[in-house]
Amino acid sequence: MGLPKSAYKKLLIDCPTRVINKNCAQRVKDVSPLITNFEKWSDKRKKLYFKDEEEMVGHFHLENFNLKNNLYGRLLASPMRAEKISKLKSCRELLIPLKVVPSTGKDQHADKDKLKLVPTLDYSKSYKSSYVLNSASIVQDNLAAATSWFPISVLQTSTPKSLEVDSSTFITEYNANLHAFIKARLSVIPNVGPSSINRVLLICDKRKTPPIEIQVVSHGKGLPITQSVFNLGYLHEPTLEAIVSKDAVTKGIYLDADNDKDLIKHLYSTLLFQSVN
């Protein structure tokens, strides 16, 4: 015995609203793995950004290591870049930046079809660049494969014959540029003396002393402070030795690590470049 039509109508149309899910018409938001699992598939760590880091340190009673005032902390805090020899990432300030420029022939005219890779002192976004380890001995051992140091974008769009690296002048050119920059800055920079707390002392000692040394010395009322000592005698550059040794009283030049950041960075790069690995 079948149900009357009125019963069907009541079941299909006049269904009580309490049995209907009001949210059934809403579409579930798509959750992309690009957002939820980005750090897993991209091999990148999560980063936390704070508007005011000093306020966070004080509010949560965190220990402040004052890395902003630390010479080596600033070097290690530079952006990470992949370098071409070891294929590993390192701090940008510990590498040699290379730039791509048009190659010039014997007539000193640029050849648009040829590109040359040369070392430079500072990174710039105005040209295509890559990086290699800041070590003269390692660079010398790998100069035979120097054309592979070009940026990937250049290697993909150029033929091997159009890429050039002058292996005979590569190391000497970079070294000469570093020395010229340091000489120019040291000849005009003031000697702050041992009064500066955050300081770097430049000396010229040809004995078997390390090129870079950290010393603990007394300051003011006998309070101990640390200072970095850069031994430019390690470079065997007579002009630099004369500049550093001209003050017989202090027997060196004191630099302010806060105001002379650029000069100190290039001094560190020079000593690192010529150090024996």
Curated annotation (Swiss-Prot):
Subcellular location per the Swiss-Prot or TrEMBL entry: Mitochondrion
Predominant location category: mitochondrion
GO cellular component, one term: mitochondrion
Keyword annotations from UniProtKB, A to Z: Mitochondrion
The keyword Mitochondrion appears for this protein: yes
Annotated Pfam families: RRG8
Coiled-coil region list: none
Transmembrane segments: none
Keyword Mitochondrion listed: yes
InterPro entries hit by this protein: Rrg8
Gene Ontology terms: biological process: mitochondrial genome maintenance
Family indicated by similarity: Belongs to the RRG8 family.
Stated role: Required for respiratory activity and maintenance and expression of the mitochondrial genome.
Name of the featured protein: Required for respiratory growth protein 8, mitochondrial
